[in-house]
């Protein structure tokens, strides 16, 4: 039994080491050492699928999931905690990500309905990469149903989402597409949720369209006591069961 226990602990140690050994700067290297140089030299965005230096972003096909894409800045922004995201001159990355959703349909071979799409960014402690990236991917069926059921309960003020999502507490706020286009969700979170501006890195944030064509912003806060790493990506299903 002692030997078995030792082997188990050894195996766990190997797993932990392997996870920690993953390079947290892979995305940054792809953007600054591959996509941007290749575009500047050859007008070829590869390995990204789109490079927009003037608009300040690139789009990359993620290796996880058949339809998941990442939108990333062409400046050095580590994540949601970066003060640049609250600067009015910074691109509205969430709205740019929404406009980039068409890459999913092109990859899929036919139009993907907007209700099936979600945008997310993870908290500082809930992410694996240290270059800002918004996940453009399918929403999970369970989350889609829960948001549909809460449609009438979500208003223009941040308020707790009834029942939470995936066992974690979330705040929800309704916005119109015009509001989403004009004002960054990062700014809305920082200015409207008490004390959020002091600890933006603790939050995961998501954007989903509702059946009435409004959008819902979803924010979850890091809480080790409830095992919530504030990985808003948890609302997504990168295998896209919602399309089957």
Curated annotation (Swiss-Prot):
Catalytic activity: a CDP-1,2-diacyl-sn-glycerol + H2O = a 1,2-diacyl-sn-glycero-3-phosphate + CMP + 2 H(+)
Protein's membrane topology: Single-pass membrane protein
Bilayer-crossing regions: 7-23
Annotated InterPro entries: CDP-diacylglyc_Pase, CDP-diacylglyc_Pase_proteobac, HIT-like_sf
Predominant subcellular localization, coarse grouping: membrane
Signal sequence bounds: none
SUPFAM superfamilies reported in the protein's UniProt record: HIT-like
Domain of life from the UniProt record: Bacteria
GO BP of this protein: CDP-diacylglycerol catabolic process; phospholipid biosynthetic process
Keywords for the protein's UniProt record, in alphabetical order: Cell inner membrane, Cell membrane, Hydrolase, Lipid biosynthesis, Lipid metabolism, Membrane, Phospholipid biosynthesis, Phospholipid metabolism, Transmembrane, Transmembrane helix
GO cellular component: plasma membrane
Pfam families assigned: CDH
An annotated Gene Ontology molecular function: CDP-diacylglycerol diphosphatase activity
Record EC number: 3.6.1.26
Pathway it works in: Phospholipid metabolism; CDP-diacylglycerol degradation; phosphatidate from CDP-diacylglycerol: step 1/1
NCBIfam families on file: cdh, PRK05471.1-5
Similarity comment: Belongs to the Cdh family.
Name of this chain's protein: CDP-diacylglycerol pyrophosphatase
Organism: Helicobacter pylori (strain J99 / ATCC 700824)
Organismal lineage: Bacteria, Pseudomonadati, Campylobacterota, Epsilonproteobacteria, Campylobacterales
